[in-house]
Design a protein with these regions (language model features):
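N-terminal hydrophobic segments of proteins, predominantly signal-anchor/transmembrane helices
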Residues: 1-17, 24-86, 365, 494, ...
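Loop-to-helix entry and N-terminal half of a specific, functionally important transmembrane alpha helix
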Residues: 2-7, 238, 338-371, 382, ...
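Long extracytoplasmic/lumenal interhelical loops at the membrane interface
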Residues: 12, 251-323, 339-349
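Membrane-interface helix-loop-helix junctions at transmembrane boundaries of multi-pass membrane enzymes
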Residues: 37-52, 180-193, 228-235, 336-358
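Alpha-helical transmembrane segments of multi-pass inner-membrane proteins
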Residues: 61-63, 105-224, 337
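A membrane-periplasm/extracellular boundary helix in multi-pass inner-membrane enzymes
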Residues: 117-127, 205, 222-265, 282-287, ...
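A conserved mid-to-late transmembrane alpha helix and its immediate loop/hinge
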Residues: 159, 163-165, 199-203, 207-208, ...
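Transmembrane alpha-helices of multi-pass inner-membrane enzymes
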Residues: 356-368, 372-420, 424, 430-431
Length: 513
């Protein structure tokens, strides 16, 4: 899995015969079939409704492409299916405990912080050093260097991603993880410094979509802190958003979505272009609502020369039709609702992990209305989505130990898992080891068990011991005698003066058992 994350940041490409592959696709093509088999067998905390919806989304995409582009079905679905389902199921398989998730958070935060010198150099000089180095390697290709006009006197940082907005989105995903998820296992100084670095790197992408996700996450964090003791604070927030939407709809001659997009851009020209894309995108959706238009070019005004569409959700509806779009959105929304409604009272670590994941994807959901994602970052988005699904079955510290024991005995508990993924999981956990060892105890340490007094406990036998050594005779005297012999022989306590000699025959014993 670490190899997958490295290839997300450094999308090295190469040709394998007629196939154009990159590191992410190669890893996922190798792993998707065994991991998907295990997922459908319920090995990764069960099979959820949204698992089925995501699979149906890809199957419908196959149908839509077969109708529109029959000669490109295998090639396109092979890459899109591997990136979408492969990234999702990889996270479902390897991120299933708090330690796994915290290790992932540390990896992402550290990876972004390490890009700071490269990002500063690129935004000042306009030279993506990492891309230039990759392109010098024999037999290896990298993504194209995207040239844009400078904004605010700075070049947009692309690093090694396919687009500057992808770098900004990668940085924004790590923000809530650094500030919220790691709050119980990191020192405050590290949290604030790393969060500031993440925000600065996100800014250097000079992408309105990425900055929108960052600002929305900061707003949600502030709202949670300000109204932390208010029971219905999130219902209040939904009500405020609804009131704001209604107010804009009544007072503006534009739709609320167009007003929102006009303020979520760096320039009025960009806002105008996105408004036209929205209008003509819906024209294409309604022209082919069932199977979409597939990979065919979309109808648009002559003034829009590029065939790109800066709206991921609209692109899904346009390409695969309303059924494909609906399956994806239902699965996406259902998972967020289920995870968002989980309560982890008494376990601050799980509470902060859940909150950070929900904040991340609430921000990302709005951002995807202003950007499109493809290739490695497309897979990464749904990898991070799958990385939070384990929270649905997670149990807070000290809750239902009997249930936890039964899960461990059946092999479904994360702690009891062993198998082929053990080396990779051990490697990933080492990233979280410093934080976990330095963190305060999540629950009070159990009080030491006092030594049993010889006389006090002789007449008060423990029920579990009696259950382990039942007597064939229900007489109280026989039961006490058998318990005394068992306790003496087992070393559970010292013999009392009234205890029988363990070597004497038992009067209640009628023969071998």
């Amino acid at each position: 899995m670490i190899l997958y994350l490295v290839f997300v940041m450094v999308p090295i490409g190469f040709n394998l015969g007629p196939l154009a592959l990159n590191g992410v696709r190669l890893v996922l093509l190798v792993m998707i079939l065994p991991l998907m088999t295990q997922l459908l067998a319920g090995k990764y905390d069960g099979v959820f409704v949204f698992d089925i919806l995501f699979i149906l989304h890809i199957l419908w995409a196959v149908v839509a492409l077969a109708v529109n582009n029959p000669n490109q079905v295998i090639q396109n679905i092979g890459s899109v299916g591997a990136e979408f389902l492969g990234g999702y199921v990889l996270a479902r398989a390897y991120i299933r405990t708090p330690a796994d998730f915290l290790a992932l958070c540390r990896f992402l935060v550290l990876s972004v912080c390490l890009t700071l010198p490269l990002a500063v150099y690129e935004t000042v000089t306009g030279r993506p050093i990492l891309l230039e180095l990759i392109n010098k390697l024999p037999g290896i290709t990298a993504v194209a260097n995207v040239i844009y006009e400078r904004r605010m006197g700075l070049d947009r940082v692309q690093l090694a991603f396919a687009h500057p907005i992808h770098y900004g989105l990668y940085c924004s995903v790590a923000f809530s993880l650094a500030f919220v998820a790691l709050s119980d296992v990191s020192r405050p100084v590290w949290r604030y410094v790393s969060s500031a670095v993440l925000g600065f790197c996100c800014f250097l992408s000079l992408s309105s979509g990425a900055l929108l996700a960052l600002i929305l996450q900061m707003f949600l964090i502030g709202w949670s802190w300000l109204f932390g003791k208010t029971p219905r604070r999130w219902l209040m927030l939904v009500g405020l958003f609804g009131l704001l939407y209604l107010t804009v709809a009544l007072l503006s001659n534009r739709t609320p979505m167009k007003v929102f997009m006009s303020y979520a851009t760096f320039s009025a020209a960009t806002a105008y272009m996105r408004s036209i894309m929205m209008d003509w995108g819906m024209v294409n959706v309604w022209s082919s609502p069932i199977f979409g238009i597939g990979l065919n070019d979309w109808v648009r005004p002559a003034s829009i020369h590029s065939n790109s569409l800066d709206n991921f959700w609209l692109l899904m509806a346009m390409r695969y039709g309303i059924p494909g779009f609906t399956l994806l959105v239902l699965g996406y929304g259902l998972a967020i609702l289920q995870i968002g409604h989980r309560k982890f009272d008494g376990d601050p670590v799980l509470t902060h992990i859940r909150r950070a994941w929900v904040f991340t994807f609430l921000g990302l959901s709005f951002t995807l209305t202003t950007v499109a994602v493809w290739t490695s970052i497309y897979s990464f988005v749904f990898f991070m989505f799958g990385a939070g699904v384990w929270l649905i079955k997670a149990r807070p510290q000290g809750a239902d130990p009997a249930g936890a024991d039964s899960r461990a005995a059946s092999g479904t508990d994360a702690v009891a898992r062993t198998g082929s993924d053990a080396p990779q999981r051990a490697a990933l956990r080492r990233w979280a080891a410093p934080a976990l060892t330095a963190a305060p105890a999540l629950t009070p340490a159990p009080a030491p068990v006092p030594a049993l007094a010889p006389q006090a406990k002789a007449a008060d036998p423990s029920p579990p011991i009696l259950a382990e050594v039942p007597s064939r005779h229900p007489s109280r005297t026989g039961t006490a005698t058998r318990y005394s012999r068992f306790a003496h022989r087992s070393g559970l306590r010292d013999p009392g003066p009234d205890d029988p000699d363990p070597d004497d025959p038992d009067p209640n014993d009628i023969g071998p058992r």
